[in-house]
């Protein structure tokens, strides 16, 4: 299971250190794509395969489904962890997530998320302010 929050920097070449606690579960290669809320999602290959199977079941006749699948897949890239524990994040994904220097890498169960410092702290601050109300809504999901 992927969990935790780690601060790292992205270098001028777009390389980011993958937290050592995540490397074994992610494997030598994993898929990074656009995420929601202005971050990037990173999936181990086995999780990506399961997600692909679900996406292939989306109804092609529905415009929203086509749009989502196109947008999600078009940015997906397989990243390989180098000997220094880094991945190279393509420019289009760095732009999507506003990654410039400081980054936060978090584990979210079966995936990682890569955030710019600024976006993560804004998101985190808002979530913390509303945590009690948010927790209350989890009842609707059977939590």
From Swiss-Prot:
Query: Which GO cellular component terms, listed alphabetically, does the Swiss-Prot or TrEMBL entry include?
Result: cytoplasm; nucleoid
Major localization listed first in the record, in broad terms:
cytoplasm
Q: Which residues form each disulfide bond in the chain? A: none
Which keywords does UniProt give here?
A: Cytoplasm, DNA-binding, Repeat, Transcription, Transcription regulation
Q: Does the keyword Cell inner membrane apply?
A: no
Select a single GO molecular function from the record's annotations and give it: DNA-binding transcription factor activity
**Where is this gene product found?**
Cytoplasm, Nucleoid
> Where's the SpoVT-AbrB domain?
5-47, 76-119
Q: Name one GO biological process term.
A: negative regulation of DNA-templated transcription initiation
Q: Name one Pfam family in it.
A: MraZ
Q: Which PANTHER family match?
A: TRANSCRIPTIONAL REGULATOR MRAZ
Kindly give the HAMAP family that the UniProt entry links to this protein. Answer: MraZ
Q: How does it assemble?
A: Forms oligomers.
Annotated family: Belongs to the MraZ family.
The name under which this protein is listed is: Transcriptional regulator MraZ
Write down the species.
Answer: Enterococcus faecalis (strain ATCC 700802 / V583)
Its organism's taxonomic lineage begins at: Bacteria, Bacillati, Bacillota, Bacilli, Lactobacillales
């Amino acid at each position: 299971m992927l969990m935790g929050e780690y601060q790292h920097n992205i270098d001028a070449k777009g390389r980011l250190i993958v937290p050592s606690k995540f490397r074994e579960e992610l494997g030598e290669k994993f898929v990074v794509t656009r995420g929601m809320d202005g971050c990037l999602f990173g999936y181990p290959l086995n999780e990506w395969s399961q997600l692909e199977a679900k996406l292939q079941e989306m109804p092609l006749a529905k415009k929203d489904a086509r749009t989502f699948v196109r947008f999600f897949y078009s940015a997906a890239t397989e990243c390989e962890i180098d000997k220094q524990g880094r991945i190279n994040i393509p420019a289009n994904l760095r732009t999507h997530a506003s990654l410039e220097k400081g980054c936060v890498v978090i584990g979210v169960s079966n995936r990682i998320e890569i955030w710019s410092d600024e976006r993560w702290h804004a998101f985190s601050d808002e979530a913390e302010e509303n945590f009690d109300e948010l927790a209350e809504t989890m009842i609707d999901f059977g939590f």
